[in-house]
């Protein structure tokens, strides 16, 4: 799931492939959720829709502009990288967690964001599919929210850490047991 336009909702993105070397390629499917709660199949209109024998996708902000770019791994061909060129006035926030008592990459840490009456959760994972690895960062779309009231991190070590008044549109480095986040 990816916040395609830094809104608060997440839109699903799918890749297709088989667990054997296919003799043909598959269409990549892209769906966006509409206001009425139904998904719209945007595959034919989407510039990242291509035929391939793909295995997984991952989302990362390669150019540090605040929006997520897409990497699709393929079974028998090179990975494809798609830069997000969408313009948006919506806000976002990223966190890079660093464990001291927990593992250094904070894999398994859960962050809970509170902004206004909204709440979001994210878990640090190392990968989500065959031939992919994620950046060890959490990215949250905030919509029009101008600040994050708090972020609470539940570390794998069992430590719970809360930071407040987090500025949007920045990458914040949170070190386990250090009471202040570094901002980039």
Predicted regions and their residues:
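Gly/Ser/Thr/Pro-enriched helix-cap/hinge segments flanking short amphipathic alpha-helices
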Residues: 24-27, 35-54, 64-184
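Short, conserved, GDST-rich strand-edge loop motifs in beta-rich repeat architectures
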Residues: 1-24
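Carboxylate-rich, polar loop motifs that coordinate divalent cations or form catalytic acidic clusters
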Residues: 31
């Amino acid at each position: 799931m990816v916040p395609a336009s830094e809104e608060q909702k997440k839109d699903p993105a799918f890749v297709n492939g088989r667990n054997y070397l296919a003799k043909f390629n598959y269409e990549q499917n892209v769906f966006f959720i509409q206001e009425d709660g139904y998904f719209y199949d945007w595959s034919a209109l989407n510039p990242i829709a291509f035929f391939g024998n793909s295995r997984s996708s991952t989302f990362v902000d390669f150019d540090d502009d605040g929006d997520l770019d897409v990497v699709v791994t393929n079974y028998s061909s090179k990975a494809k990288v798609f830069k997000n060129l969408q313009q948006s006035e919506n806000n976002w926030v990223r966190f890079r967690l660093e464990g001291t008592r927990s593992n250094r990459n904070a894999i398994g840490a859960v962050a809970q964001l509170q902004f206004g009456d909204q709440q979001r959760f994210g878990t640090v994972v190392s990968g989500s599919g065959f031939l992919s690895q994620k950046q060890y960062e959490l990215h949250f779309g905030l919509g029009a929210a101008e600040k994050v009231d708090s972020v609470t991190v539940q570390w794998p070590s069992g430590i719970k850490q809360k930071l407040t008044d987090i500025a949007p549109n920045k990458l914040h480095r949170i070190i386990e047991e250090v009471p202040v986040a570094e901002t980039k």
